[in-house]
Amino acid sequence: CELRFHPGCDQAYIEETASSISNALDTVKGDHPGSFSLFSNFESNSSFDEYQRAFTDIKMRIDCGDCYQVNLTQSFTAKGDGEPLAAYLRLRRATTAPFSAYLNWNSGALLSLSPERFLGLVDKAVLTQPIKGTRPRGSTKEADIQLAKDLLASEKDRAENLMIVDLLRNDLGRVCQIGSIEVKQLFSVESFSNVHHMVSDVSGTLKADRDALDLLTSCYPGGSITGAPKLSAMAII
């Protein structure tokens, strides 16, 4: 685990934050986080008919050329009781997600498990790894291999992935050095505990006068959660 701060952060703030995190870790170290349970089923924020109408409208907008890809999603809500950390640890045991986070405030907690690297920055080296294209894991080794092959060969998933790769190349181009942006890997399949994902790698070198916040501002929100072109997709959503 590595803690990084923006270069412009005040030293006193850095020390205070690091101390708070250290104290919090000491508090939970070795302690059982308690338990967490749901006492209601998950409910969507939209009915099936509403979702179907939205899907039909988006398809029409794509046919009209207003956009190429829209990431239509829905949220689910359930009631629960217990320690949020226990829920997070249970989720971690259920699925592998290399980019996970647990943040707890007085007003609530954020439990995040993501397989996708939105942005990585080491010195001036930038890396983004968009995911588009998913298949479930197979019940047998043979079925699992075939599902991964099907994903890799899918023209639809390749097209969606390529759209987001192009979008991110454009986003990085606003803050990276000219000529530094490269697609290091295109249409790779990565396997996790529950699914196969199609992943591509896009890299670049940040301009000398730009920093991490400039990079985030240029790329947020990630194209894989909006669609392409980004602004058109967001307006439709």
Question: What are the functions of these language-model segments?
Answer:
Residues C1-I237:
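Extended alpha-helical targeting/anchoring segments
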